């Protein structure tokens, strides 16, 4: 069970519990003083109001815009129960989440996946239908060191030995830089683009990424066993998972859904929530 799913369900529980009593009703009494619904709501709003409201609105918008069958929800829910076994009911009790609330969260998650799927083009699917390649790399911090390593390779020195000597990647350096086989979408874009241009046993020029500079060597190429048509569903699933982790993409997608739903917030303290998101999206567009 994903923690994010539990968190989404939990925020709904908090908000719903605040709606079940009148504003002056006491939800806690003690010798130290009482707590009313209004006091609780204001405190909750101050500490987590924007996040809670964002989650609740997104849940409603996604479920409204993308139809999810009950059988899809039940299947996903059963998978979660099976994954956590005997701990499942305990986790729900700890979070104060009812089955119905969690299923609503599951429905929203599946609706979000459908929203992402709708953005995936045939070109993207074809671009990600690639052979698996096996590669090694030497990762260094600066361009000067990368050029030095490339020069030493040109002098006939062993790629594996230079990886052990220079590479900053602790996970692969002792294996001579070996990264094993990987497919499309598994590496950062700069690395992947460079690696897929190489032939077997060919070595790249220094490639800059967020991690530093890479010298890449392709050591094997494995052509796909399945046809493109047979692979489409798996490729789409991987792209959905990848895009769901892309904050900029998801913010842009959700803002489009919010705009279509004509969302307006009446609470004076929270009314700018989606305006702030629109501003953030515009900043990203200008970069």
Curated annotation (Swiss-Prot):
GO biological process, one term: protein transport
Protein's cellular compartments: Cell membrane
Any one GO molecular-function label of the UniProt entry: peptidyl-prolyl cis-trans isomerase activity
Reactions the enzyme catalyzes: [protein]-peptidylproline (omega=180) = [protein]-peptidylproline (omega=0)
Chief place of localization: membrane
SUPFAM superfamilies hit by this protein: FKBP-like (SSF54534), Triger factor/SurA peptide-binding domain-like (SSF109998)
Residues with a covalently attached lipid (N-palmitoyl cysteine): 19
Domain of life (superkingdom): Bacteria
EC number, UniProt record: 5.2.1.8
UniProt record similarity statement: Belongs to the PrsA family.
UniProt-listed NCBIfam families: PRK03095.1
Name of the protein in question: Foldase protein PrsA 1
